[in-house]
């Protein structure tokens, strides 16, 4: 309780989280998971290699005693130690961590009271604490409008004006996405594990 985890216990063995769970490493994982040029297996494999400090290539994945648990615990870490994803439940990507970098950092900087990109280390959970404390901001306005567009809600006049004046923030793919469930069956199939 009230600890920032820097390792994951898998089968009684501790596996270090790369860079002690720094937010930049997690954002790299998010980019890997969203990489449309990779298939699902490659996305998950890339993400596990980025996430676990002692896993640096595909062959080293065998060091993990249970790939399924390793993947589930990684996702649990992303979700701030929760089994379910915190925040707004939606079937749409409302944030693009790469394209929205300046907006995200500006809003987080305002909450944190410093330029977050200049600190050598900031744990993912700390970063997300700042992120969840973002109040009224350009980012909040943009995400609110994106949500309305994605869910086919009518925009207010000021939102239409903002959208028309800032089209660069609204050229996203609003098609529905499916939450990738790291199901036992899928992971066994991917990793050829038989239990």
Which stretches of residues belong to each language-model region?
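C-terminal charged interaction modules
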Residues: 71-195
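Short N-terminal mixed-charge amphipathic segments
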Residues: 1-56
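Acidic-enriched, low-complexity/disordered segments with a strong bias for Aspartate over Glutamate
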Residues: 22, 28, 35, 39, ...
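Structural motif
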Residues: 16-17, 36-43, 61-65, 94-99, ...
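Alpha-helix initiation and N-capping motif
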Residues: 23-26, 38-45, 64-71, 101, ...
């Amino acid at each position: 309780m009230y600890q920032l985890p820097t390792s994951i216990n898998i089968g009684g063995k501790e596996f270090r989280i790369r860079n002690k769970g720094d937010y930049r490493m997690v954002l790299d994982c998010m980019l890997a998971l969203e990489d449309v040029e990779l298939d699902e297996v490659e996305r998950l494999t890339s993400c596990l290699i980025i996430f676990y400090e002692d896993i640096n290539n595909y062959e080293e994945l065998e060091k993990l005693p249970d790939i399924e648990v390793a993947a589930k615990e990684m996702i649990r870490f992303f979700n701030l130690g929760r089994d379910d994803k915190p925040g707004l439940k939606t079937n749409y990507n409302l944030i693009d961590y790469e394209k929205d970098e300046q907006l995200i950092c500006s809003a987080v900087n305002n909450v944190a009271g410093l330029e977050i990109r200049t600190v050598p280390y900031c744990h993912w959970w700390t970063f997300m604490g700042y992120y969840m404390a973002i109040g009224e901001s350009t980012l909040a306005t943009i995400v609110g409008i994106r949500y309305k567009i994605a869910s086919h809600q009518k925009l207010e006049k000021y939102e239409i004006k903002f959208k028309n004046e800032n089209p660069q923030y609204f050229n996203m793919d609003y098609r529905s996405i499916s939450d990738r469930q790291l199901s036992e069956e899928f992971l066994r199939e991917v990793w050829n594990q038989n239990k």
